[in-house]
Curated annotation (Swiss-Prot):
Keywords: ATP-binding, Cell membrane, Ion transport, Iron, Iron transport, Membrane, Nucleotide-binding, Translocase, Transport
Protein name: Fe(3+) ions import ATP-binding protein FbpC 2
Bilayer topology term: Peripheral membrane protein
Source species, domain of life: Bacteria
Record-listed ATP binding positions: 37-44
Catalysis performed (reactions): Fe(3+)(out) + ATP + H2O = Fe(3+)(in) + ADP + phosphate + H(+)
Length: 346
């Protein structure tokens, strides 16, 4: 297979500080990949290397089988790549139509083509006469996408394009952008620090940490079977407990739990997602006491101090509970584990 993008052994430093170390991954044509990680982990630098805004210190980058960095070099304007920045980077004193037309060859800058591009991103062609400051943040990002689409790129790079939008607008804009790119069958890479955004937007997710790729997989794989505890805790709420693993079972503060088979034995740590822990009021399962409650509307986050019954310092877990039944600090509850835990060597 010829990949839409291949990154192999890429390093990058600035001023003596190492930003990327041995980054390697491949992206299939027509797919959507999200690169997610905390601020400063190197994800935007990686995107800029792919775009051609920076040169790697080592390693190679190939687009559709053609080396564009490494043994050869192609500048940004000679790569079939679209780029949408966090702030959209629209020209503030130009009209929407002029902004979109900037991505077109001069002879193709016709009202009909600009109208077509605006309609692709669910904007009425009449918006062409407006200025960017007359649009909402979500509309501005869609104009930026239309400008990037004008070049008919083989690869679209999205650098945290939704982060400046409020929650409701962000979700709606994300859905529109995802739909546009899927219909156009354009290979897409999204960089974000928002874990739910990465999981919902992409076919595959790459988790970055300290300049390296910690794990690449489907959203379900990344969430359900993270490669290590730091990845588990970064990608979502996690309950991590000390345990003793024997075969497919582990003994921990929540009792005997089933673990996914991954070769871990003996003293270890096990990870569960909060939704795997069922809180009951009938006394079934391991018992504990509610010590704090965080109300989140349709759900509650409960801090529960577990009863160990053996004189040890009680272990505390945070679990998610749905439904209208109110619990308050001091309430006695039972806990049952649903599904399999993931075990990690110490």
């Amino acid at each position: 297979m010829t990949y839409a993008l291949e990154v192999d052994g890429v390093d990058k430093s600035f001023g003596g500080a190492t930003i990327l170390r041995g980054v390697a991954f491949a992206v299939e044509p027509g797919s959507t990949t999200a690169i997610v990680g905390p601020s400063g982990c190197g994800k935007t630098t990686l995107l800029r290397l792919v775009a051609g805004f920076e040169k790697p210190d080592a390693g190679t980058i190939a687009l559709a089988g053609r080396v564009v960095a490494g043994s050869g070099w192609a500048p940004a304007h000679r790569r079939s790549v679209g780029y949408v920045a966090q702030d959209g980077a629209l020209f503030p004193h130009a009209t929407v139509g002029a902004n979109v037309g900037f991505g077109l060859p001069r002879r193709a800058r016709t009202p009909a083509r600009i109208a077509e591009l605006l309609e692709m991103v669910s904007l009425d062609p009449s918006y062409a006469a407006r200025r960017p400051d007359q649009l909402s943040g979500g509309q501005q990002q869609r104009v930026a996408l239309a400008r990037a689409l004008a070049r008919e790129p083989e690869l679209m790079l999205l650098d945290e394009p939704f982060s400046a939008l409020d929650a409701g607008l962000r979700a709606n804009t994300r859905r529109i952008v995802a739909d546009v790119l899927a219909k156009a069958a354009i290979t897409t890479i999204l960089v974000t620090h928002d874990q739910p955004e990465a999981l919902s937007f992409a076919d595959r997710v790459a988790v970055m940490s300290a300049g390296r790729l910690a794990q690449i997989g489907t959203p379900r794989e990344i969430y359900s079977t993270p490669v290590d505890v730091p990845t588990a805790e970064f990608i979502g709420d996690a309950v991590v407990l000390s345990a003793r693993v024997e075969g497919s079972r582990a003994r921990c503060a929540l009792g005997d739990v089933t673990v996914a088979s991954n070769g871990v034995h003996g003293n270890a740590r096990v990870m569960l997602r909060p939704e795997q822990i069922e809180v009951t009021t009938d006394g079934a399962g391991v018992s504990g006491t509610v010590v704090d409650v965080e109300y989140l509307g349709s759900e509650m986050l409960l801090g529960i101090r577990l009863d160990t019954g053996d004189g040890e310092v009680p272990e505390r877990v945070t679990v998610r509970r749905f439904g209208a039944t109110a619990l308050t600090p001091g309430d006695r509850v039972g806990i049952r584990v649903l599904g399999k835990a993931v075990a990690y060597d110490l």
